Regions:
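Acidic surface patches and DE-rich sequence motifs
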Residues: 5, 89, 145
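Type IV pilin-like appendage domain
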Residues: 72-131
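Short, hydrophobic secondary-structure boundary micro-motifs
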Residues: 24, 71-72
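Aliphatic-rich helix starts adjacent to a transmembrane/signal segment
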Residues: 2, 9-57
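Residue-level preference for alpha-helix termini and adjacent loops
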Residues: 46-47, 53, 70, 114, ...
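Short linear sequence signals and composition-biased patches located at protein termini or domain-edge surfaces
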Residues: 112-164
């Protein structure tokens, strides 16, 4: 009688493979979740830092060129107090920075451009009401990350000296 060669896996071998794969999956899943969370957090931090620095730099440069007698602090409709500044610069251009929702806009004469879409709060104030040549600018940016969390970066208040 011929002996038949049966090829295949036994039930025990399959159960061992399933058990090993289950253990590996259980160990790798949290690692992948943590890696994704870290990557998105780092990406959000980099984005909001860049947005905040660029926006603050552009606002500071423009405010330095303002005619101090033309500076008006107000708020855009339905926005936080003192979230808008408008003035005329030394060349006679009308300049305005304002918050609308989570966006920061710059208006230069009639041209409006978005500076950042990650704005949480911006405020323009005179720290010393007797000196209209010094203005404080405070700004908070925020970006959503992984699993509904958010990362916020608050820049400290920067004082800007109006040169004109």
């Amino acid at each position: 009688m011929k002996h038949l060669s049966v090829k295949g896996y036994t039930l025990i071998e399959i159960m061992i493979v399933v058990a090993i794969m289950s253990v590996v999956t259980a160990l790798v899943s949290p690692l992948l979740t943590n890696m994704t969370s870290f990557w998105r957090l780092t990406q959000a931090r980099t984005l909001i830092q860049r947005d905040a620095r660029v926006s603050m730099d552009l606002m500071n440069r423009a405010i330095r060129q303002a005619q101090s007698s033309t500076i008006v602090l107000s708020n855009y409709p339905n926005q936080p107090p003192y979230s808008e500044i408008s003035f005329t610069d030394v060349k006679g251009n009308f300049v305005s920075f304002y918050q609308e929702g989570n966006y920061l806009y710059e208006k230069f004469n009639t041209t409006v451009s978005m500076m950042t879409k990650n704005l949480e709060f911006v405020s323009f104030t005179f720290p010393d009401s007797s000196d209209p040549g010094i203005l404080s600018v405070a700004m908070t940016t925020q970006k959503s990350t992984y699993l509904g969390r958010s990362k916020a970066l608050e820049l400290s208040i920067e004082e800007v000296r109006v040169m004109n």
